[in-house]
Amino acid sequence: MPPSPPSSAAADQWNIDYVNEDHLKAFAQALSYNDVQPLDGDSSPLSPRSFSLPPESPQLSTASVKAPPPTWKYGPDNGTLRSGRDTEERVEKLTATSDFAPIHQRVSRKRQRATSQGLTYNVIRWPLLFFIFFIIYLEFSAYVITRQIVNIFEWLVAWRGYKAKLRKELRKAKTYDEWVNTAKKLDKHLGFDDWKDVEEDSYFDWALVRRVRRTLTRLRAANDTRGLMDALAVCVRANFAGTESVKMYSETFIGTKKAVEAHIKEVAACLDYVRTATDVSLEEKRAFFRAVNKHYGSSALCLSGGASFGYYHFGVIKAFLEADLLPRVITGTSAGGLCAALLCTRTDSELKELLVPELADKITACSDPFTVWFKRFRQTGARFDTIDWARRSMWFTRGSLTFKEAYTKTGRALNISVVPSDRHSPTILLNHLTAPNCLIWSAILASAAVPGILNPVVLMAKDRSGNIKPHNLGGSRFKDGSLREDIPLGSLHTQFNCNFSIVSQTNPHIHLFFFAPRGSVGRPVAHRKGKGWRGGFILSALESYIKLDLSKHFKVIRDLDLMPQILQSDWSGVFLQRFSGDLTLTPRSTIGDWFHILSDPDRPQMKRMLRVGERVAWPALGMVRNRMTVERAILRGRSEVRTALSHDRTSNDPATSLPETNPELTGALDHVPIESDVDAGFVSRSRRARNKTGSKGGDTPEEQLNLAGVFQLDESSKGVRRRKQKKSGMPLVAEPLGELPEVSPTHSPIATESPQRNYTSNFGDSFRHVRAPSLPALSSPFRSIRSNTSSSSNNVQSPSSSQRFRSQLSITRWFGGVSESSSDEEDEDLGGLQSGEATASSGEEGIPTFQLDSAVESHSDRSEDEMLHSGANVKEEYQSEESEGKIPIPGGERVTQEKIDSSMASGERLRPAGGSKGSAKTPPVQDGA
């Protein structure tokens, strides 16, 4: 189907000129400064402060312009030397950077002789290096031959007959729907559908997944929101029980086991149920979604370098865009940085208009003829001109946008990896957190500054006045980040909590070594029903052995420092860094791509690259969709709870999309920030706002009065207080509810602190409860420490508190993600109690426990000993409910904080259909039983 003609808005995108000549002049001046001889004052790029724009810039007044730095002239035609102290022009001698690159590089006059590393090193270094390279050459030849034998074996043995025909149709599919239909035919023909139906498998904990899914369904049917939150806190984790393992998606062409699909759908449905529940406060929801978001993490799309091979990334981006599965965190290096910049500076609607073959008309970086770039290479040591590349790249970055401005516009976090020109400086990941005011086009140039291709560049940034100045961040000049860290997974995990990485790998020197002997995502082994080895076990083992031995030789070269510096760069880590992620996509390149590795694509080539990139991404969409289903359910909860806390309203539709105030923009400020540290600022602002009004407890005096009347705490309790500034509290002994005491609007009751949780033991106890035959044992996985406490004779108890009960307090105290001094946690602790008759008894270490006599007792309110004692009754209860078919899966009502407060004040709670009063009649187990 031919593409539709571009709209008027799209036509404007193609014709807009984003070039800013003033910014280019400032960039040229920054490049002219000498790195070796530091200048005095604040005009040095090596100093913390940045120098001013050139005098001809209209953005600065003449009074603010600094004196120009001394001029450096070099070469045979530098003019006649003048003597005297008033000499303004200085002459500097030239020396070659290395024998491999005799370029015009300014160096200091006085060079200290380096200390020798020893006679043995100098004598053995070069013979050992040549010997290792000879071994590498032999092993690489053997590796190429092995791979070709594997291809011949699969062509002769594996892909024959009808499945070979289906495979050709799969590779020629033009749309995702065509690919899906052919993939289903292949799964049916090869018998992979039978593998999907069988629940048991050794690659994941199928028994645990089944029990968790059944438990979540029952808790959701019983309207036990807090029990559901407890269970979700355990199972909403990255790769829980192996459900996100690549092996689970490498046995079929499309999809995975039905048990895994059902588990993911149930988890997403439970998250939406918690989001729309009315029997928990908004503060509890906020703490819960923050905790599960921290455990589950976020996804990231990583675009590697690869010169002209990197344009395959556009096809991968298009496939994820059309499937609405683009992650919010995007990173790119070198050529991938250019693709990532286009992705993160345009909205979805704009990208759909730009990802067409006509995009090749805007890629003109390599358009200079041979005579021009060869002369430039002889003079400067680089094939391309930095200023010319800056001018051409401004269209992709939408002018001089900064990282922060791009994040504000699209909601996507752009990350560019760069390396300082110094050999021992660490890699720097530029984004809206580490370099918010840095210009994206300068970061792209720095990331593409491969030695010999482009000289190291200076990063540029906007100041408070909007002027362009050098950005000194860990160095003065930067170069290609793929030399050391092509895929910055460690920095992404630290800054954005990325636990799932999607890597599009196009580096030509790495692409050949990607080989999956047991199949990859959406590409199973064709013979032995997916259980065999590609090319047989012997060839697969030989391929793995040769590849590991090659890596060993490169590590020896790096560790012994045998590799000389070529073009002032260390190339020893080019083959030793990590180039893969949790899900790695390798577009299928051709031999012709090697001959155009530094050439611009035309429209036919761009059309082919877009199609190849889409086809390599289609098999992975099923795995990414399952991951994004849970991730976006968490994001919906966080987003709507934050909106409700600000505007006291939230949507109840589980299918509600993320809010967008401006239809033309993604509206990043309306979304929940990706980085988790921003929530700490949200809590801090809430605390400061309440301190200004003098309120330390409820938001209003009425709320404080209601909360104070629910229970009173005994001053004899010596438990640790959550609020350190509160050194005294209300009595602990419970009194009959009569006339509520008068409470000052500025006084708040003290919330007790739950016992310190030992997550090492509790996490194992949680799984023990999941495997228990009785359902309610799962409902409180974080309450297992109650078994460690025993009754004390000096505990103060009321007559009706002889039985031990666990309080159903705030979810905030069950996780460790919120500050202990947060006043919001106090409100959650107090707001989590239902009104009604409550009795308190102090347990060990002065920790009170509460008995809540509400209309219907939730299963999660019962102690674990009580659950084990009455497990048979609970089982019969649920079996009777299931047989009668009276377990509804409720939707959500419209939730507001006023409705939650009113339901809490009246003592109302949601009753599960079919009745669950029988569980309340079970006699509890006494202490010490």
UniProtKB/Swiss-Prot annotation:
Q: What is one Pfam family matched by this protein?
A: Patatin
GO terms for CC?
Answer: membrane
Bilayer-spanning residue ranges: 126-146
A single GO molecular-function term is: triacylglycerol lipase activity
Basic and acidic residues bias (residue ranges) = 856-878
Q: Which InterPro entries match?
A: Acyl_Trfase/lysoPLipase, NTE, PNPLA_dom, Triacylglycerol_lipase_N
Q: A Gene Ontology biological process annotation?
A: lipid catabolic process
For this protein, the Enzyme Commission number is 3.1.1.-
Q: Where is the composition biased (Low complexity)?
A: 43-54, 779-806
Q: Report residue spans for region: Disordered.
A: 37-85, 644-765, 778-806, 818-929
Gene3D superfamilies, from UniProt?
Cytosolic phospholipase A2 catalytic domain
Keywords per UniProt: Hydrolase, Lipid degradation, Lipid metabolism, Membrane, Transmembrane, Transmembrane helix
| Predominant cellular place of this UniProt entry's protein | membrane
Name the family the entry cites. Belongs to the PLPL family.
Q: What is this protein called?
A: Patatin-like phospholipase domain-containing protein CNE02340
Q: Please report the organism this UniProt entry assigns to the protein.
A: Cryptococcus neoformans var. neoformans serotype D (strain JEC21 / ATCC MYA-565) (Filobasidiella neoformans)
